[in-house]
Regions:
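A structural signal for small-residue-enriched, beta-sheet-centric alpha/beta enzyme cores
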Residues: 1-70, 74-84, 94-119, 123-394
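Generic structural marker for isolated residues within well-ordered, non-membrane alpha-helices
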Residues: 90
Length: 394
């Protein structure tokens, strides 16, 4: 059985049907009463939702010990009333959990520009926050979904020193996926004891290598937010580089797992695409090239159609003149098949390339051969299903 957030000691979570959606759980809470640190990464969208602004402000001064989450309504572009509704959600949740309102974050996802049905939310909150019912992480993973087809859950653990350190997380996302500091909604918990400053740095590093390397449709949401709570069960030495690197790698692993699950469940997707860029002169170059390929509608549609037109890859790789790249030294592979070597096409048969494109996971490797920096990005193919889902969404 898959482990969830609530399999980490000191973490409580669940969800309930409040009526925001027609017939599914749509209101959830994560409660970490003993949290010693919390961290968050947020969208930089100019129309950031009130939940983003409120939670970001709380994190600057306090350690969050809970977050109240709703799906089906973004509460974005809803003016002063939207801000008041966000604050009310935090205040009422805090009362029920015996916390300060500044210790409760708020996260929302769904349709933009529609007021929250506060009477439904306030009616459901007391039942949701009953301590005896806060033991269902799986239900919460389902409640945060919108156009997603599947729940997205991760649970990672590793020995650091003599302690078993755990990181668990849930996320949602299927469309409007192109990150700017975060992507969609994501919630992580870990049993480490570190300072807020260190946890924030580690989360930011993990997001930069995972969620920020993810693209379904190049659209950035108004509500993007990833939060992380530390229960404080096991201390790791913040001055010990080996221990800190081990924790950073564990957090990276959890975030990458969640990001790949989002890409695989992209709206209308039939194929997961992974673009690995290696031997670039700078990390920024490797990252930019990977994102250019994963963002390209021409690449996405070619992969969906299993079309071995590799010229679209070359277009995407080289379209930014600021990247330090020598076209005469670039190698490109699709799966195990080398299609470009030293900037020129190989004599590979189109049928061999098409065979690679029939797989469910498409690996594209770009070897710049002139440096030591690497980056990986994830996305999915672009299909008619994407259009159908978004014309029907309301």
């Amino acid at each position: 059985m898959k482990k969830h957030l609530t399999d980490i000691d000191g973490v409580f979570a669940s969800a309930i049907e409040s009526g925001i959606k027609k017939s599914k759980p749509d209101l959830g809470v994560i409660y970490v009463p003993g949290a010693v640190a919390s961290a968050g990464v947020f969208t930089q969208h100019l129309f950031s939702a009130s939940s983003v602004k409120y939670t970001r402000k709380c994190l600057k001064r306090h350690t969050l010990k809970a977050v109240i989450i709703n799906s089906g309504n973004a509460n974005a572009v809803t003016g002063k009333q939207g801000d008041e509704n966000t604050k009310t959600m935090a205040v009422e949740t805090a009362k029920l959990l015996n916390l300060s309102p500044s210790e409760v974050g708020v996260a929302s996802t769904g349709i933009i520009g529609v007021p929250l049905p506060m009477s439904k939310i306030l009616k459901a909150l007391p039942k949701l926050c009953q301590k005896e019912s806060l033991n269902n992480g799986q239900k919460l993973a389902s409640a945060i979904l919108t156009t997603d087809l599947t729940e997205k859950v991760t649970f990672k653990e590793a020995k650091i020193g003599k302690k078993t350190i755990q990181v668990s997380g849930i996320t949602k996302g299927s469309g409007m996926i192109a990150p700017n500091m975060a992507t969609t909604l994501g919630f992580l918990v870990t049993n480490v004891n570190v300072s807020q400053v260190v946890l924030q740095r580690c989360l930011k590093n993990a997001i930069d290598r995972s969620y920020n390397m993810l693209s379904v449709d190049t659209d950035t949401s108004t509500n993007d937010m990833v939060l992380c709570f530390a229960t404080g069960a096991y201390a790791i030495n913040e001055q010990d580089h080996e221990q800190m690197n081990a924790f950073q790698n564990l957090l990276n692993e959890a975030c990458i797992d969640l990001a790949k699950q989002i890409a695989k469940d992209g709206e209308g997707a039939t194929k997961l695409i992974e673009v690995h860029v290696k031997h670039a002169p700078r990390y920024s170059d490797a990252k930019q090239i990977a994102k250019q390929v994963i963002d390209s509608p021409l690449v996405k549609t070619a992969i969906h159609g299993e079309d071995p037109n590799w010229g679209r890859l070359i277009m995407a790789i080289g379209k930014n003149e600021t990247i330090k790249l020598n076209p005469n030294k670039v190698h490109v592979m699709i799966g195990d098949t080398v299609i470009v070597e030293n900037g020129l096409p190989t004599k590979i048969e189109r049928a061999d390339v098409k065979k690679e494109l029939k797989k469910n996971t498409i690996l594209i490797t770009v070897d710049c051969t002139i440096g030591s920096s690497n980056a990986t990005a994830w996305g999915c193919d672009l299909t008619k299903g994407y259009i159908d889902i978004n014309t029907d969404y309301n």
